[in-house]
């Protein structure tokens, strides 16, 4: 948390990440944000969404819609003016630079739930690099934003945040913990499901989160805040 002379509002969960099937009357949470942070996160979220969208299942109408919007955003022919055409061209070039080809499916490093959707052996497999730093920063943003929304608490620089991208291995005890004690928010359709657990004593507050986006991108986060 820092002090700024002026602030804006930022959507905790990005507007462009909501599925078309999301209920129309849901509250799309916003929190105070400085303009600089808002701009930084907007670029980060756009880059993440652009990369993730190419890995979605086009047989699912919701996922297909996200992918179609992203492909349109990097297609120069849809540019409204010269500046827009140039921007789309740069985005497309940057995206293509992050695509690699493999003869066999890599045995490690694949984001859970974003691997091949068919067991058919292909001549080659296209992969796209997802920045682990961007994923972690995005997880931190959700954690900070929802901590403010649900608990009216601000995360300071001295507080600890950890974001954990799991691979469904050795986390049974964590799953059991959430099954027993978590408060669950699932009124946003499949856009995002949020589960949270809060504990505190005389010296610190501990909050655990589980985020499930599109029933695909799943991760946990942990906040340790000193009183």
List the predicted regions and their residue ranges.
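Short Fe-S-cluster ligation motifs
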Residues: 26-36, 63-78
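Exposed alpha-helical structural elements
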Residues: 47-48, 65, 69, 134-137, ...
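C-terminal, charged low-complexity interaction regions
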Residues: 103-227
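Extended, surface-exposed interaction regions
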Residues: 48-68, 94-97
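Histidine-centered nuclease catalytic patch
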Residues: 1-30, 46-47
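Short flanking/linker segments adjacent to small metal-binding domains or redox-active Cys/His motifs
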Residues: 71-114
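Short Cys/His-centered divalent metal-binding micro-motifs
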Residues: 30-51
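Hydrophobic/aromatic-lined pockets within catalytic cores
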Residues: 17, 38-42, 147
């Amino acid at each position: 948390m820092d002090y700024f002379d002026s602030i804006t509002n930022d959507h905790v969960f990005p507007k462009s990440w909501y599925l078309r099937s999301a209920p129309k009357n849901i509250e799309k949470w916003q929190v105070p944000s400085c303009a600089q942070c808002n701009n930084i996160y907007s670029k980060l979220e756009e880059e993440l969404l652009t990369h993730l969208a190419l890995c979605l299942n086009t047989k699912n109408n919701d996922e297909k819609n996200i992918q179609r919007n992203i492909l349109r955003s990097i297609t120069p022919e849809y540019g409204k003016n010269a500046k827009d055409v140039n921007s789309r061209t740069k985005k497309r070039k940057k995206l293509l630079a992050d695509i690699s080809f493999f003869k066999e499916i890599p045995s490690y490093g694949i984001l859970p739930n974003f691997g091949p959707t068919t067991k058919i052996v292909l001549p080659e497999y296209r992969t796209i690099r997802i920045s682990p730093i961007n994923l972690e920063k995005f997880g931190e943003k959700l954690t900070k934003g929802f901590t403010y929304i649900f608990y009216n608490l601000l995360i300071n620089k001295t507080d600890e945040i950890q974001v954990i991208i799991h691979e469904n291995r050795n986390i049974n005890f964590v799953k059991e913990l959430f099954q027993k004690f978590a408060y669950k928010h699932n009124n946003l359709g499949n856009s995002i499901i949020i589960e949270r657990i809060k504990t505190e004593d005389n010296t610190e507050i501990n909050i655990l989160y589980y985020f499930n986006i599109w029933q695909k991108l799943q991760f946990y986060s942990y906040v340790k805040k000193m009183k």
